[in-house]
């Protein structure tokens, strides 16, 4: 009997680990679906603050639409003059790495953003290029760390650790911990940890508004760098559910049109 118990214990542990990992991924997946839109258009204000509180402000126009299993996003900077015309195209692929291109009007050239640049700063802000696209859950090991109350909301703490060093280099962090509200599956906050395991950045989501399709959209997002004191905020100025833009609009040719 004792021998049977010793044989069964590792199996029970393995099964419980698999169930926990599956549950954690399911929570992360539901959190993504809670804010997933097939099509939308919006304008937003990006505010970039340095460690002394000095601000730079950028106005952005953004359009996104899903074609089959692929989500395509095109954003253009409207102001100020030094960034006006800068544009980015993001192709969110379901089962492979995302594709990104950026057009710099000063160079009159469109170039591809390679995978090692996705964890780099998005236009000088504390957001990364990767933050502009939807996360690929298959690139992480997911684990429930427990529960926590954040701003009066009962949340799951779900850790997503990069599968390998290559993904760490691509993302710009080693792991992240998301605080996901249990009733709505809306992500309230995400903590990012650097390659040494130290807290790096914290992103908070606020002013969620329910749309006509039953999904929610966060009208404010803030990223705080805990290591250098800098922060950046994206505030949605106008939001439109749906889009009539054709698929050929989401192309590198459109990037270069002013």
Predicted regions and their residues:
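Bacterial N-terminal signal peptides
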Residues: 7-16
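Gly/Pro-enriched, hydrophobic low-complexity segments
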Residues: 89, 99, 103, 109-113, ...
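A short, amphipathic edge element
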Residues: 25, 56-57, 132-145, 197-202
